[in-house]
Amino acid sequence: MADTVSKHIDMTTGSLWRNIPLFAFPVAATSILEQLSNLIATVIIGNFSGDQGTLAMAAVGSNVPLTSLMLNLFIGMSLGSNVVIANAIGRNDQNMVKRAVHTSILMALVGFVVIALGEIFAEPMLTALNVPAETMPLASLYLRVFLLSMPSILLYNFEAAIFRSVGITRMPLQALAVSTVLNIGLDLIFVPVLHWGVAGVAIATAIAYTVSAATLFIRLLKTDSVVRVTPRDLAIDPVALKRIVKIGLPAGIQSAVFAVANIIIQSAINSLGTEVMAASSAAMSLEYVCYNLLNSFSQACTTFVGQNHGARQIDRCTKTLKVCLVEGGIVALTTIIVIVGLGREILSLFNSDPNIVSIGYIRVCSIFPAYAFSMFYENMSGYLRGFGISLTPALITMICVCGIRFYWVFCVFPHFRTFANIMMVYPISLGTTAFFMVVAVLLCHPARTYRATQAKATAR
């Protein structure tokens, strides 16, 4: 069934106050659905793996930092496709749209390289993460099988970026919703019935993502939108590839930096004992929802600015940032009030132990208010990326997030070994990042720079 162009969100005309939430909320729902699928898989593997339940959960959990690092890198790369295609649509450059779309589809082939490297380096990578010897066989098995899904995961994310560049955000959500139901169903067959353990969970993930990627590919073949895919045109275009990598690689590194920094923090948390680990894990589940909501406005900012920059509607680019800051701020404030206000009650649903609830609430009170800073720098970063400025926000994130968190864990934490102390690094690093991101926007001032360039060109 072909999609009609009327289903997309018009980013260059109409109300930004209405269109940005219409874009952002399906993006947020897609990310939250992915987290929900992973959470349910963990519950299934923990409850239906017999005597190996705890070991199986540890095996899957020990892979999270590694898989998150890879996924963040490549999902960031897909943002490059989003910006390049959105900008070309704004310029009405259908030739570049076509070349960028078909190049993006083939970029998912990088997933096969990841499979090959993963098969070779699975155990060395897990050893570097200090995975215990008794967990290593299952952890290595899970990673090797999970990596088989990498081409499908990459293809899905590049396809989703293509659809979002033209303002179609519900379709990736619908495809993922179907695959999530399939994933949970397969988990319930492969683990409790067939007793495949961690391999069953990884196989279910691979099948589910293959279905979602295939669904979006078929839609791209049938769509009457400008991003339609024609198999005979599938080729890597050097110009399109260079533009995508120029924006996408720094964005991918920026996302991966968070994963690296969080690995370091998690190692410090682990050193404080099992109770702290359990409390921190429960609170972290709430953070994913909040972060995905805020990040969806950043993605909206990137895409809307990209299209309007291409269409030379620079005033609308600036207004996009303002709208994203206001609406993202409202979402952030609402989430902070609800979670902090009901934090103890929500945490008790994960674990009724009063001590664990109290420890988890320390994390809630430390991190959730700091998401106000996160909202600022995510939207500022998205604004710069929409203008094609991707390296600057990546460098700021690397220095302010990774640098401060590394320093805190290795230089401050050893002298004050408390959970509250390690949690302080979040507001400090996020606040510093937000400050320098605002400075970067004021110094780069892409809208003013664009107008000055156009004025000089006109004068000639």
PLM regions: where:
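Short alpha-helical transmembrane segments in multi-pass integral membrane proteins
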Residues: M1-A24, I85-S149, L182, V193-L249, ...
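N-terminal transmembrane alpha-helices
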Residues: M11-V43, N47-D51, P65-G80, V84, ...
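Transmembrane helical elements of multi-pass membrane transporters/channels
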Residues: L22-T42, V145, Y156, S179, ...
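Transmembrane alpha-helix boundary and packing residues in multipass membrane permease domains
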Residues: V27, S31, V43, V83, ...
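Helix-terminus/linker motif at the lipid-water interface of multi-pass membrane proteins
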Residues: I32, L36-A58, L126-A133, I189-W196, ...
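Small-residue hotspots at the loop-to-helix junctions and early N-terminal turns
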Residues: T54-P65, A139, L143, A202, ...
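Small-residue-rich hydrophobic transmembrane alpha-helices
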Residues: M57-A116, I120, I153-P172, Q266, ...
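Short runs within selected transmembrane alpha-helices of multi-pass transporters and secretion channels
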Residues: I75-S78, V145-R164, P172-T180, V201-L216, ...
